[in-house]
Design a protein with these regions (language model features):
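Charged substrate- and nucleic-acid-binding regions of tRNA-handling and nucleotidyl-transfer enzymes
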Residues: 83, 87, 157-243
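Conserved, hydrophobic alpha-helical core segments of structured domains
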Residues: 1-165
């Protein structure tokens, strides 16, 4: 369908951003140009992530270093994705879901395998994700989007015979996430034991500062879940009251 739109000239009117990838070589770990890789990934992706698959590398033409690297294409891709979907009048929730998948599809999770030397294992262990890193990953992606992100990563690899990606990376990260999920996990503001009313009870005035402070508290709790008690959070928050 997308290719037919291109051949008839309609794609330029509907999603000209996709055409930017036509003929843009990826070298290194890709066989197709950006445009055809996006179409191929969309073809193999499950229905619920086809849009994310179609857009996941859409930022590459604007970040092309002309040496096979596209630094920041995930961030640029998120921006373009939001622009396209807003223009096409998608619901805000769907725009945010797809944009998050595009923004985070380049994750890298280090893991060890049998047969590795001790030196290799030591290097990987130095890069191991802490519980805090896992919580931040989930918070960034959205807990409800994690499985879709894994499906996107697998579709991306399936559409590219030259990929260096190994499915075990997803399997190992899934295990790590399960370990963290089994603990008391705080990944969003509503998981905190206090809310805006609690902040107002100690002197905060209703307004933007409440949201700002709650997000600052969340950042602290992502690093140290032991801080997620009413007493500790209110003590920290009390130091942020604007007199």
């Amino acid at each position: 369908g997308i290719e037919m739109l291109r051949e008839t000239g309609l794609l330029e009117r509907i999603m000209p951003e996709l055409l930017e990838g036509y003929g843009v070589e990826q070298k290194l770990f890709h066989h197709d140009d950006v445009y055809h890789h996006l179409l191929n990934t969309c073809d193999v992706a499950p229905d619920n992530i086809k849009l994310a698959a179609l857009f996941h590398d859409i930022g590459k033409p604007r970040t092309d270093m002309h040496n096979g690297h596209f630094y920041g294409h995930d961030t640029e891709g998120e921006k373009i994705t939001r622009e396209i979907m807003q223009r096409l009048k998608f619901p805000n929730a769907e725009i945010d879901r797809v944009a998050r998948l595009v923004r985070n599809h380049m994750f890298f999770f280090p893991y060890t395998e049998d047969g590795m030397s001790q030196e290799q294992i030591d290097v990987i262990n130095e890069k191991a994700w802490t519980d805090s890193a896992v919580r931040r990953f989930i918070a960034r992606v959205g807990e409800e989007n994690v499985d879709d992100l894994f499906a996107l990563r697998i579709a991306d690899a399936s559409a590219n015979p030259k990929t260096a990606f190994q499915p075990k990376e997803v399997e190992e990260l899934q295990k790590r996430i399960s370990e963290v999920r089994a603990k008391d996990m705080v990944i969003k503001v509503t998981d905190l034991v206090i809310n805006g009313e609690d902040l107002m009870s100690i002197g905060f005035v209703a307004g933007p500062q409440i949201g700002i402070v709650l997000n600052e508290l969340l950042e602290l709790v992502l690093d140290d879940p032991m801080l997620n008690t009413r007493e500790k959070l209110l003590e920290i928050a009390s130091q942020k009251i604007i007199k």
